[in-house]
Amino acid sequence: QINYTCTNLAEHIEGLDHNSVYRYLKHERLTPRLIWEHAQETLVMSAVGCIIFDDTVADKDYSFEIEGVRKQYSGNAHGLVKGIGIVTFVYYNPELDRYWVIDYRVFDPDRDGKTKLDHVNEMLSLAEKRGVQYKTALMDSWYATTQMMTRLHQSGKVFYCPLKANRLVDDTEGEESYQAVEMLSWTETELQQGKLVKVKGFAKNFYLKLFRVTVST
């Protein structure tokens, strides 16, 4: 078994002890601002760049007194785990095929009352203030809210996100009632090229191109 932890570093560097490493890790704070400053050193932006909203859970199953540790859903574990939730903001340059983490937030609603969507909105506003160039946003269904998609649309951006199976949409231009995505019927042409739908709650003339994609889980 290979131990990649920072505390195990003391076993391999002469003159470095576990207590020194522990004290450093305990007091070091890699803040979102430091992440941005570090990313700026190598960040190459593109007019066709992409931003990616995502989140992960740092497993802390055996930790009981670390700030921010709570039970929360993990997509990787497909269930509740004990850990620290982290919302990440990633920049991708498709011309160079390179990624940069340019911002993050700790998801700790018990401390600050903020949702994951709140964090993403804050990071997006900050990225715009910093002059981050992008054309496309990629996000999970968690962030595919009416507010977020409308914001991106009004900014002239393209976005890709999955819609939950029970999301109500209309593909009949108002001739029939809204129905769940999973209940839609698809022609062969629509399976190849997608179909226009209106998501319930969106502005009257706001249509999305919906594609049916089979993925493995």
Which stretches of residues belong to each language-model region?
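A generic local secondary-structure boundary/capping motif
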Residues: 76-79, 149, 197
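Domain-level cores of phosphate- or acyl-group-handling catalytic modules
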Residues: 109-174
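Active-site-proximal, Lys/Arg-enriched surface segment
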Residues: 25-96, 205-206, 211
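An anionic, glycine-rich sequence signature occurring as long contiguous blocks
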Residues: 97, 102, 110, 158-217
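Short, conserved acidic/polar surface loops in the N-terminal third of protein domains
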Residues: 61-67, 100-103, 149-150, 171-172
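Electropositive, glycine- and tryptophan-enriched low-complexity nucleic-acid-binding patches
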Residues: 19-23, 74-134, 213-217
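A structural signal for short, well-ordered beta-strand segments and their strand-loop junctions
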Residues: 5-8, 50-53, 101, 136-138, ...
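Gly/serine-rich nucleotide phosphate-binding loop at the start of the catalytic core
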Residues: 1-31
